[in-house]
UniProtKB/Swiss-Prot annotation:
One of its GO terms (biological process) is cellular bud site selection. Disruption phenotype: Diploid deletion displays a weak budding pattern phenotype in a systematic assay. Partially overlaps RPL39. Disruption phenotypes caused by deletion of this gene may also be a result of a defect in its overlapping gene. This is Putative uncharacterized protein BUD19. It comes from the Eukaryota.
Length: 102
């Protein structure tokens, strides 16, 4: 009878020492364990989204400014060759020497 009691005690001990039902990959915040990662008020996700939004808006504004600047920086070459006027309009960002007006 003592052998059976020891055997039952060992089985109960094994049951109590089993692994916890919580996922091992969860994030622990505020001393709370959860099965899903849930940052404190989603701040890390919010900051990440905000940084992406700011970077995208800066890129968009720089493109708009550059295109607006290009629109206002058109230059015209006028060359008079024996009473024949040749004109060529080019962007200020390109080298006008590449146009051979003869």
């Amino acid at each position: 009878m003592t052998k059976s009691l020891k055997h039952k005690y060992v089985l109960r001990l094994d049951v109590h020492l089993g692994s916890s039902p919580v996922s091992s990959l969860s994030v622990v915040t505020d001393s709370v364990v959860g099965s899903q990662s849930d940052p404190l008020w989603q701040w890390s996700v919010l900051l990440l989204s905000l940084s992406h939004f700011l970077l995208d808006s800066e890129r968009l504004l720089s493109l708009i400014k550059r295109e607006t600047y290009r629109a206002h920086t058109k230059c015209t070459i006028v060359k008079n060759v024996s009473n024949n006027v040749q004109t060529h309009q080019y962007d200020a960002f390109t080298d006008p020497r590449q146009y051979h007006l003869t």
